[in-house]
Amino acid sequence: AFMALMNRVFQPYLDRFVIVFIDDILVYSRSVEDHAEHLRITLQTLREKQLYAKLSKCEFWIDQVVFLGHVISKKGIEVDPKKIETVLQWQAPTNVPEIRSFLGLAGYYRRFVEGFSIMAGPLTKLLRKGVSFHWDDHCQQAFEELKRRLTSAPVLTLPSGRGGFVVYSDASYQGLGCVLMQHGKVVAYASRQLRPHESSYPVHDLELAAVVFALKIWRHYLYGETFQIFTD
């Protein structure tokens, strides 16, 4: 209810210079001048709606912020170091609920890891109905590789304006993968495992499935844009 209220209050400014999550308000701008105006509008809106922010919990004019498990700065977006520390300390799962917990945390940052779903395959297989839990060398290797990739995750660029998007997609009988780039910098990675019926597809159909997957998952960036897409 409170989240819905905040979204209504800031609806004219959402995704323009304001992001709201429950009672957290993030104001972002491209220049100092813009930021001064955006802050004025945000604070004035709160005042008009008789909503009050506690000064001790506010931070103003910062060039880096931790928000929803990410560090956002002018360099781009990266994984919160505190979350990386949690990943490093994670012990190998000994049952299905522990696998779910690990994949829940790791999956939250899947956009930072190229081929995440394919890499996690040995772990997700243990989540299937009727499959007995057996942690073998393939599972351990996948677990360690996911931890390594997450703890060395790259800084992803934040999309800037319109145009310049390029999509690279690929497919194999292990899964589908794609990369979204803008002006030569990585915006996000995406991947998924094959669905049961797709395992019988010829390779060229899988390549097309990867293209469709990329266009669907990044449609909010690509809709109405002219862009390039490369596939095998």
Q: Where do the protein language model's features map onto the residues?
A:
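A short, polar/acidic, helix/strand-boundary loop motif
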Residues: 1, 182-209
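Short beta-strand scaffold segments in enzyme catalytic cores
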Residues: 176-180
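Two-metal-ion RNase H-like nuclease active-site motif
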Residues: 164-171
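Active-site palm subdomain of RNA-directed nucleic acid polymerases
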Residues: 1-36, 116, 216-227
